[in-house]
Amino acid sequence: MRHIMAKSLAPTDGVRDYLAAQEKKSLLRFLTCGSVDDGKSTLIGRLLSDTKQIFEDQLAALERDSRKHGTTGDDIDFALLVDGLEAEREQGITIDVAYRFFATPKRKFIVADTPGHEQYTRNMATGASTADLAIVLIDARQGVLRQTRRHSIIASLLGIRHIVLAVNKIDLVGFDQAVFERITESYRQFSRDLGFQTIVPIPMSARYGDNVTSRSESMEWYSGPTLIEHLETVSVEEAVVELPFRFPVQYVNRPNLDFRGFAGTVASGSVAPGDEVVVAKSGKSSRVKRIVSYGGDLAQAAAGQAVTLVLDDEVEISRGNMLVSPAARPQVADQFAANIVWFDEHALLPGRSYILRTETDQTSATVTDLKYRINVNDFAHEAAKSLEMNEVGICNISTRSPIAFDTFAENRTTGAFILIDRITNATVGAGMILHSLRRAENIHWQSLDVGKRVRADMKHQRPAVFWFTGLSGSGKSTIANLFEKKLFATGRHTYILDGDNVRHGLNRDLGFTEADRVENIRRVAEVARLMADAGLIVIVSFISPFSAERRMARELMADGEFVEVFVDTPFEECARRDPKGLYARALNGEIKNFTGVDSPYEAPEKPEIHLKTLGRSAEEMVDALEHWLNERDIAQPPPADNGGSI
């Protein structure tokens, strides 16, 4: 019985032949984009229908859904094939990115249907990130619109170099050649600086199928290809096989003591047994001994193939490393310039710390300079202090540790990255690396003989940063001042960084916007780190309202060195105390961006020390702090490290 079942489940010769034929076809990834209601989903539905990709039960369901949700009268509404969300069907719009696979005898396709509404531009950018070609739809009645320009500019920024200009709904203007030519010329004028290699204009009616897969009888004046003819024949390959070899290591394959290989997918270029390879960041080299695949050893592996590489030598390599060609290595730097498309409802702020993830690396990163925002309607450069959702900007980025990369123009796989919010773990932005910053390559750490351990030994204490956070009027400065006096009286070496005092000097140029608050804390955290490196016990007393910046400050310090102290006083009590009269003015609207009133305060979730002040004196708070300090032997010299040799 088991033998019969296995035999019945085995692929037939016909299936094998079909699969073999599919493997030989090239794959084209493309997306549809343009303004809302230009017919993007309808076009994809028409393509799927005319290329026989719809089963009978799907067609029956489509006819039923068209009667319920359709916008085409008694005709089938092909847009419903790809608008799967209930909200999309109810509103007749696309919200999320929908991917569909289909094939013709000549080629395989993966198409991304992207939304047209401006508030979903980030979804469109997601679809464009892997596409080779973009179909930009334009309603023949409307011409080139704001969102048409926006999507075209984003497609250009994301490396798409081939455009099909689909002038849709041509039937609604009487198949007028003059309308088609006017729109074509308008789009060419707009896009002349966007770097597109090809722009192929095609007049069509997605609803009725004119010039989609069959030539229109109503447009004898048009002699160009139908849409499917162009998609089947367009050459978009960027010769990734001819690019320098890049192999991001996904994991170390070690099934037994006698085998050690490095598994991953070849991102670009090719490799063969005997080829020399280099670990991108360490510079260690070896040679490829074997290329192992599921079907056996290979004589060569090229871009797109998932393989395991076995090397001649026992080179230290782990997940996240990248094997590369020694003749054309990627750049390794901790500072670079990049295009960023912002996805999140909370703005990108220079100075705020994010997690940056590339094909190979993950590290902390900060936008050190927002150079300008790109107006995606006319490509103009605009001054900006932040990037809001769906905006695009050019930024300088600094990473905590060096990463290996190519520019996005050279390699779309190793030149791209995403930014992740440290608190929510949400992907908040996507970036394309433009170039490394020369100053990053020319600045090196100077080796110094006197280090943190030596300085701390001399003071007979362990460095620490006590970071006091809480609302204005919570008692931070009072408690911090008493705490320093008690430490100083016992012979400890201390320094207080107070929020108000620092704004008279180091941060006098900053205001109280969210962006300025982020920069305020970034500067203070760097100063606190330097003071801890000097062996001091640093007491920082700042409202520091945002969790992300407090986490950034923590990561600057050595393990166990950062002590978050939450001075927890209810808002009502702080407003009652109001020692500086600020709450009264803020509640009257005289002060803007006041924490707790019209600017948020994100309370610590797990502070090392939680001081609940209501009904307790400042002296009691200091006693609790000192008890915590003594329990952890902060007064004792730190353990030996490599921080100094004297």
Swiss-Prot record:
Q: Which GO terms describe its biological process?
A: hydrogen sulfide biosynthetic process; sulfate assimilation
What reactions does this protein catalyze?
sulfate + ATP + H(+) = adenosine 5'-phosphosulfate + diphosphate; adenosine 5'-phosphosulfate + ATP = 3'-phosphoadenylyl sulfate + ADP + H(+)
In this chain, ATP is annotated as bound at 470-477
Q: G2: where is this region?
A: 92-96
Which residue ranges does the record assign to the tr-type G domain? 25-240
Tell me the PROSITE patterns matching this sequence: G_TR_1, G_TR_2
- What EC number(s) is this enzyme filed under? 2.7.7.4, 2.7.1.25
Report keywords, A-Z.
ATP-binding, GTP-binding, Kinase, Multifunctional enzyme, Nodulation, Nucleotide-binding, Nucleotidyltransferase, Transferase
Broad EC category: transferase
- Can you tell me which residues the record assigns to a coiled coil? none
Q: Function of this protein?
A: Proposed to provide activated sulfate for transfer to Nod factor. ATP sulfurylase may be the GTPase, regulating ATP sulfurylase activity.
Q: Which HAMAP family match?
A: Adenylyl_sulf_kinase, Sulf_adenylyltr_sub1
> What name appears for this protein in its UniProt entry?
Bifunctional enzyme NodQ
Instruction: Name the source organism.
Output: Rhizobium sp. (strain N33)
Its organism's taxonomic lineage begins at: Bacteria, Pseudomonadati, Pseudomonadota, Alphaproteobacteria, Hyphomicrobiales
